[in-house]
């Protein structure tokens, strides 16, 4: 995997994808009887000379905290087309999701399997920064279709908090 595929959070910088997967597994191992939601979402901000994208990866231990990290992407031009911007946001989320699906999701699931009778569960979602209100409503079918074709549940506003809240906070 390319060196540019690096993540960070407020505690750690320069995490490789493998580092991120180890952090996720360690978080789950602390409480393998819990229910988890692993979500990925991307948001963007257009600046004068470039467009900044942030992909957020968020593992929520339902009712008991979360662990997350971020990845920067920069396009060296302002992107004013809403369709292009949302399409790139979706593509960046798909890229991270594809890496997780490549054996890594099973690693996390394997940690929870012995405890499924005690409440252990894992849901994997991609959160899109689109919704039924506003200009993005015309993009819902296309973008959610790209996610569901990967076998992943797609969430839109108001349920897509990893994109519109977590990632958004770091695009400014």
Swiss-Prot record:
One Pfam short name: RNaseH_like
InterPro entries on file: Phage_KVP40_Orf299
Name listed for the protein in its UniProt record: Uncharacterized protein YkuK
Biological classification of the source: Bacteria, Bacillati, Bacillota, Bacilli, Bacillales
Encoding gene, per UniProt annotation: ykuK
